[in-house]
Structures are given as C-alpha cells and as structure tokens.
C-alpha cells in the first residue's frame, strides 16, 4: 500500500517483487496457484500485496470474483518471491514482542528498485493501538454507510462511540437501528 503512489505508473515494468516475512506467514498465507473464492484470496499474502500495489488500499470487496478477474493480479503474484527473515520469525513468537514484521522491495526491468519498505508492527497491532483506533472507527463508519443512509449511519456510529449511552440502550432498540425500514 505504501508503495502504490511510487509504482502505480510502472506496474507493467515490474520485474520482481521481493517480500520478506516470518515463517508463520509463509506457512499460513503464502499461496501460489489458483485462488478459487474470496476465502482463498483473503488468506493469500501475494493476493493482498498485489491489490495493495494496484489500488493503494485493500477492502473486503477486493476479495470478490469481479475484482479477482483483473489479470494484473495474477501477473503480479507470479513475480513475487517470498523469503523468511529468521529474526522476524523469532520475534513473531517472542511474548514481549509479537512482531508481525514484513518488508517489501520492488525491482524493475530497467535495473532500478524501490527502497525496501519495512513494517514491524502494522496498524492494529497492540503496540500501535492508539494509531489503530481511529482507523478502525473510520472503517466501521464507512461500512455502515454501505448499507445505511447518512442519518442512520451517524446515529449508530455515535451511539457506539458513547459507551454509557450504548450500555443504557436496550438490545431491542439497538437492533431496531439496524432494521431496514420498508
């Protein structure tokens, strides 16, 4: 995602994509070959990286069949080389760190490369909780807006942001906020 702006005009000039990660990621989500459905795609490191490079973000809809039909995704997946960094693997398992480190570098046909981009603790990791909460709140509100109009979206969102008011709301009243009116 961080490299999108830098490489978006050079997608066709990519020679290889070097991804360095930890053993658990390689074992669990590094997949080659055909991805048959959204569940396959959301458990594929290479698919997620390809979407991030192509779009600059990654949302739930990106795992659906209509997005997956883009031939550029598999072209990029085929150019990916996945390597293990032993330090990443060790720190992933260390209780005081639980690092989820990854690094990426893109190499082009003309011999140039991007800088290596390394993230040891991604947004959402407990060490980045303060940074992650606003991202999670935005994601929640954006997803509400997919289904509800602005008024209902704001009503649900604001209620959920006010713990005291939320705790005082009956389950029925809360559920009714989510009921689509005919």
Which residues does each PLM region occupy?
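Terminal-appendage/accessory-domain detector
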Residues: 1-182
